[in-house]
């Protein structure tokens, strides 16, 4: 590989890392979100709430294992000021509903239109787990499958006071 090509690759990697880093700590503007169960989440529904947001797809085996942990987190944190929301990248509501039923998942799910994802990360990997604090600031954007212990620790990370 030519020196110029190596330099271009290095600069591209650095710029991508910087772009990702600049999103962490930024305020999230919540869009109106239509859940597959018919519920509408208006931006005001997020005030004072921390959030764990997971982007996933039905065809992803890593997402299947990850979502089992997300379901456990959702059930364990219902009484806390923490909202768990998942956004399926599939684009087919019926497919996602069948998938949710067949796996026994009860966590809230919407189809991803890309708006919220672009506000949280420049990365396109799934699963992608994002943590937003109660002040609506993005605290973490975690690519890939996580262990059960790490997923369960997200509640503490989301609810921790800023600073």
Q: Where would I find each of the regions flagged by the language model?
A:
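Structural microenvironment flanking redox-active thiols in thiol-disulfide oxidoreductases
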Residues: 64-103, 114-118
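N-terminal "domain-start" segment that seeds a small globular fold
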Residues: 18-43
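Short loop/turn microsegments at loop-to-beta-strand junctions
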Residues: 28-29, 51, 126-127
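A short acidic/small-residue loop/turn micro-motif
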Residues: 16, 48, 145-147
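Short active-site neighborhood of thiol/selenol oxidoreductases, capturing the structured segment around
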Residues: 45-61
């Amino acid at each position: 590989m030519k020196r110029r090509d190596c330099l271009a690759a290095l600069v591209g990697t650095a710029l991508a890392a910087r772009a990702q880093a600049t999103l962490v700590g930024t305020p999230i503007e919540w869009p109106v979100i239509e859940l597959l169960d018919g519920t509408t989440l208006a931006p005001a529904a997020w005030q004072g709430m921390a959030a764990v947001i997971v982007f996933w797809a039905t065809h992803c085996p890593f997402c299947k294992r990850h979502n089992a942990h997300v379901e456990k987190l959702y059930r364990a944190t219902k009484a806390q000021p923490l909202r768990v929301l998942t956004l399926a990248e599939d684009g087919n509501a019926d497919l996602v509903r069948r998938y949710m039923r067949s796996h026994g998942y009860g966590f809230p799910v919407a189809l991803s239109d890309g708006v919220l994802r672009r506000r949280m990360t420049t990365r396109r990997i799934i699963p992608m787990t994002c943590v937003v604090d109660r002040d609506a600031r993005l605290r973490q954007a975690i690519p890939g499958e996580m262990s059960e212990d790490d997923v369960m620790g997200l509640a503490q990370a989301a609810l921790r006071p800023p600073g």
